[in-house]
UniProtKB/Swiss-Prot annotation:
Gene name linked to the record: shkD
Bias kind Low complexity: ranges: 25-70, 79-107, 127-200, 211-236
Entry's family note: Belongs to the protein kinase superfamily. Ser/Thr protein kinase family. SH2 domain-containing protein kinase subfamily.
Gene3D superfamilies membership: Phosphorylase Kinase, domain 1, SH2 domain, Transferase(Phosphotransferase) domain 1
Domain SH2, first and last residues per copy: 641-734
Residues annotated to bind ATP: L283, G284, Q285, G286, S287, F288, G289, S290, V291, K304
Assigned EC number: 2.7.11.1
Protein name per UniProt: Dual specificity protein kinase shkD
Record-linked PANTHER family: DUAL SPECIFICITY PROTEIN KINASE SHKD, SERINE/THREONINE-PROTEIN KINASE TNNI3K-RELATED
Keyword Transport set for record: no
CDD domains reported in the protein's UniProt record: SH2_ShkD_ShkE, STKc_MAP3K-like
Amino acid sequence: MKRFFSNLFKRKQDQNSHIKQINGPTTSTPTTTPTTPTTPTTTQTPTPQNNNTNNNTNNNNNTNSNNSNQQKKEQAQASPSTNQTQTPSNNTISTSPTVTTQPSFTPGVISTSKLTTSPPESPRPPTSTTNTTQPSTTTTTATNSTNTNTASAPTKTASPSSPSATASPNNNSNNTTTTAATTTTTTTTTTTTNANQTASVNHTSSDQSLNAQNVTQTNNNNNNNNNNNNNNNANNTKPINPNDYIPLDFVDSTPKVDNNQPKRKASGPPEILPEEIDRTDFLGQGSFGSVYKGKCRGQEVAVKIPRKQKLSLYELTSFRHEVKIMSKIFHPNVVLFLGACTQSGKMQIVTELCQTDLEKLLHNDRTKKEFSLFRRMQMAKDAALGMNWLHGITRIVHNDLKTANLLVDINLRVKVTDFGFSQIKEGEEFQDKAAKGTPLWMAPEVMMGNPYNEKADVYSFGIILWEILTKEAPYSHHKDYDIFFNAICNEKERPPIPADTLPSLRHLIQTCWDHNPQNRPSFSEILFRLNEILIDCAIDFDDGRKYWKEHFLVPKQELQEEVEWSDFEKTLKATHKQLNLDYAPLKELLVQQSHQTVQKTKQVVTMERFDKVSKWFGSFFEPNTGIETIDNINKLSAKIWFHGDIVREQATSRLSKAAEGAFLIRLSSTEPKTCPFTLSMKNNQHRRIQLIDENNFTGFKIQGKTAVYNSLIELVEKCNDYPLLVPCPKFTQETFNPYDPYTN
């Protein structure tokens, strides 16, 4: 390299002496050439002040310049061994080192020789929109000595990372000739100009010089915008109109990223940088690690910090593979995986944020009373749906399925979390001994270190079902791990199931935690069993359960927890086989608006409402007794004093507007099976009406009174216990729709 630069400087001196022999001594214009190891060389001279006054002189000199070029061509043919570019100049010569040796060429003549070898590859692809060049061997800037104005504008030789181009301001673009040619080692560009023009000789690769033909760009006074001289483009700046809309300044909140880090791919697992995650509140801690509430890219998220941060190369590769799998799982009952930071020592998992988890709901003294068994079984079904998706799509074994890993969102939908990522999970300690996972929910084969499959998650789900049923923690009496291990793995101990448990639910729990994994059902079968259990939980009567299972539970299909009224009415008509039966009053009692669809006007019959109406009036869906029951509903609905399903506060409000001695009869939701109706009177008096069903006799009486009546209508008409004088009228715009009982 040292010898290369010494030879280069020697050739430069020979070139300068040769120029002096041709043109004689000249006066060089002062030039400032800032040079740094990493920035391009810039040659600057004073900008001409009265450029337009020299246009005529420049045009006259153009002919002489062209003749001079022709003479030089003839001289070059006589001496082809000349190895330097000769250009008359009184200006500064700016040079930069070349990478290759120069073959012989004719001075002043564009080289047309073919490439003998392929040019060197550019380290970066050429960019046509930037004024940058590859490292050029020689850049010569000159002005005609015969011109009276020898000052020229600054000439820039751009950075060595882009295609070659020399920017030179000139208003006389029609007098400019710019050419570029390529050879195996050197490309020479000779430009002949007048007093305000420059001659540039640049070396470019073959691909770059094809795109560099006829390129001469001008620099405006601010040296910011460049226009093409050959197209005569002027520098036009649109004036700012004060009436124009000016947007607010954009404040870039993007974290500053180190450019030395490897670039992230546009596709693949979502890699998140540590500086993009902002942790705020601490949410909890488990076998996975610590969980925080935080923000990532403007979104509220849950941030999980694994305990295990130092991974081997194999573990880190496996972890990144699991991240890729997690990013492809989308299901409403699986917590949405948003991304992960996989840098060793800074590993973090980012997921959607949920409000709470099932463990807190079941064991909190306030919240555990708010959920019926039917609602809790719906939560169990949500968890089974998520696990069935994981087992069926990705073949993922959770290994740590428990109520704490079943998150609950604001809509009380349960979502499975903390699945996968086995490389960064550590065993939760139970007297310092455990495999990966939590021992209380762990299958025996996992605790014993035997091979296991997805049926280990089924065992854990059996413990979860027991916990959902009883709202108690499993194995609370065990404190020692060795005793616990022996009880579960050898003695096959399981939590006690309450005696009043539904037979269908008892059977499912027992099969799920069976000691033999082969006897445990799959989650697909569990879902079907849970559909049956949901019907058993929602409907108390055996004939009602049978009716719903026969008509609205299709094998291998989803359970219809809500049935549109039109479909429900068809099944009733098919059962009763009587065309002139009026179902309108029954519809007012049964129909609710759907909670499962966005379409609020959709009228449906739910399993819970079906059960409640059956308790109030009897089996209206039976082929024989159902017709009589519907007839009784129609007669009762025609009475002015029957107000249907309204609450106590609403009954008091209506009676306050009525005359003295006013009363009404409403449906009771507290004990609909034993006391289906309530007598409400003025002055905030409410008495339950008890159903008498014994010895093949059905009748009614006011609770606390002795008189028994054959029907509710007879009770109202013949009651002597209370002065039922004035029936409280119903409002004309009011219906019995229980979904909106406050309509007045």
